[in-house]
Amino acid sequence: EQASAFMGAGLLYGQTIIVQREFDAEDWLRLVDKYEASSTFSAPALVRMICALPEEVKERYDRSSMRVMVANAAPWSYALKQRYVADFPPGSLFEVYGSTELGVDTVLMPEDQMRKPGSCGKPAPGIEIMLVDDDGNEVTGTGPDHHGEVFVRSNSAFDTYYKNDVGYESNSRGDFHTVGDIAYRDDEGYLYICDRKTDLIISGGMNIYPAEIEAALEQHPGIYDVAVFGIPSEQWGEVVHATVVRSPGSSLTGGEITAFAREHLASYKVPRSVDFTDELPRTGSGKLLKRQLRAPYWAGRTAQVG
């Protein structure tokens, strides 16, 4: 859906659209160089592959034409943004938060990418955002301790789901609608997405957001990609687990990962177990299929929190 919107806008303004039949990181750079491509959009997984190419490969291609890179589909970690601005014009990076149902809701401008790590920006023009706590009250405070579910009022929002009015209405509060993301605001009005409500880990009564742990672990040079989720624990209900893709040439161990996590995270957020894989399951657009990683651990259980 997002691809259609971006390409449609490009055609409307008379731009040339360049389409890869199948993603290949070096070929993507070749196309940018050949056609002097000036704007694009991407999920983090694809940009991670581009930035991970050897320096001698990247240096073969001119990337200076890129004026707009829209980060979408999933949050880009601060570490990935640092890699991107080292390889591309720093003023080209924009980040948006939104969904199929609600459209584009926030925008983080290039000048704020390094200044506001973890933020997805401020409400886009014509967008109203309300945060609602677990008791149904509007959240008015700022900072990580004042988080709530994100509800959006937008003229581009769906009227309903196809043949599922009840499902859509259950995610609505009047003219405001949600897709289940949890966030907080800072004192300048910037929004920070904590995680999807369904990905929340509840361990010993503590709420843990996997996205925070993933962002911290991605700072380790030996970690190429990582997914964090909850697995069953008789004692705690759930505990934190990390599935890691090592960087090329890395021999990183689980013990080294947990030691690194202890330096950057509160003790209850440190992964209690780690495993390794060659590749994380993702959709064609690069979205992580975390449910596929979780499923084997929760097979035969009726709930994900004991």
PLM region descriptions:
Residues 113-119, 169-171:
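Short, P/G- and charge-enriched loop/turn segments at secondary-structure junctions
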